[in-house]
Each structure stands twice: as structure tokens, then as C-alpha cells.
Regions:
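Contiguous, well-folded functional domains in the mature portion of proteins
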Residues: 1-207
Length: 207
């Protein structure tokens, strides 16, 4: 955002110097202000805190809407183990910051290049560019979170590293533009969200 602000400032300076009409300058200035405000809104990264009295609770990692709740066989890390998949679709207007869903230790981090088809499609989970993170808590519960790029998203940022500790209330990463997050959690987990339900990152209890 700093470089965008600098670029817009330089552009307006050039227009101010080179254009005799102040009308054109003010139009350009208004467009620049609108552009910067849009990017400032889109890349917002709010600080949120949640208090939980159960270290096994899994918190929503993202703002969005639940589009998948189904049992699956997970092969990337869990070698075909049956797990419950919960997917959250993030629209272009959603906050695109991602939070840690479970306090514990990061056991696995991988980034995969791929396609950029619409993130709400089921096959996007495997075919699109994505990053996978596995977290294990103090009680041995393991979950996987997968950040998935969408049709517009072209960059996934993951802040955590393997063999480091992580805690809820901390940011896990960021996905730029419309995208999706998949959670793979133990089959025996009690699910507290329904299909179509809106989630708030680092606030909504998933399981």
C-alpha cells in the first residue's frame, strides 16, 4: 500500500504540473483517493481476540460462508485417513486475512502451484494454487488448514513455519482476492456450524 500511495502521489504531482486545467487535476485526485480507499479496505487486516476455555476448540480461520461440510479421505498428509472437511468461501469483499484455527505446533507447511479456477468449485481444493498447514495441539489433535487461491487470487501468503508454536488470535496468512479455506478435522469432532452459515475469522467456533 505504501508503494501504491507513492505512485498515486507522483501521478497527481505530474498532472498538477503538466495540466493547465485544475478541473482535470481534481478529477484525477478524486479517482486516486477512491482507488487508494478501495485497496485500503480490501487489504484490511483487523486484530481480533477470542477467549476459549477448551484448548481443543477449532476456531474459524477466515471470514466467509460455509460451503462444504462432508467426510473425506485426506491423502496429502493423513495418508487416506477419513476426516471431516469444512470449507469456507471468501468473497471479494470478505476480510482476506487468515487466523490460526487451533493452538499448538506447526507440523507441516507446503505450497503448491496450480490453476486459478473459481474457489467455490469442489475441484479447486486440489487443482488450484494452495498452501497446506498441519497443526497438532497439546492433546495430540491434528488438523489441516488449506489456503486456496481463487479465480482472481494470485498470491497466497503463509506466515507460519514448521516446528514452531502457534496460537489462536494470531494471523496464519493472507489470500489476495476471492478465495477459499478448507479445514480437515477429526471425524469425531462436534460441528457447530451449518452449510451456508456466515463465519467471522477468529470468532466463530467451528468444532
Amino acid at each position: 500500500l505504501f508503494w501504491l500511495l507513492l505512485l498515486l502521489a507522483l501521478l497527481n504531482l505530474v498532472v498538477y504540473i503538466e495540466t493547465p486545467s485544475r478541473y482535470i487535476f481534481f478529477i484525477n485526485l478524486l479517482i486516486s483517493i477512491f482507488t487508494f480507499a478501495f485497496f485500503l479496505y480490501f487489504f484490511r487486516n483487523p486484530a481480533r481476540e477470542v477467549e476459549v476455555d477448551d484448548e481443543n476448540l477449532i476456531i474459524a480461520p477466515a471470514d466467509g460462508r460455509v460451503v462444504v461440510i462432508e467426510p473425506v479421505e485426506e491423502y496429502e498428509f493423513f495418508e487416506g485417513k477419513k476426516m471431516m472437511q469444512i470449507s469456507i468461501f471468501m468473497s471479494v469483499l470478505s476480510v482476506h486475512a487468515n487466523w490460526i484455527p487451533l493452538s499448538g505446533t506447526v507440523k507441516y507447511v507446503r505450497h503448491y502451484k496450480g490453476r486459478h479456477i473459481a474457489a467455490y468449485l469442489p475441484k479447486s481444493s486440489h487443482e488450484n494454487e494452495h498452501s497446506s498447514v498441519v497443526i497438532e495441539n497439546a492433546n495430540g489433535i491434528q488438523i489441516m488448514m488449506r489456503q486456496i487461491a481463487g479465480a482472481l487470487a494470485r498470491r497466497i501468503v503463509t506466515y507460519v513455519a514448521e516446528n514452531t508454536s502457534c496460537n489462536i488470535n494470531e494471523h496464519l496468512g493472507f489470500i489476495k482476492f476471492g478465495s477459499r479455506v478448507d479445514l480437515f478435522i477429526p471425524m469425531e469432532s462436534e460441528i457447530f456450524v451449518d452449510l451456508g452459515e456466515a463465519t467471522i475469522g477468529n470468532e466463530t467456533i467451528i468444532a
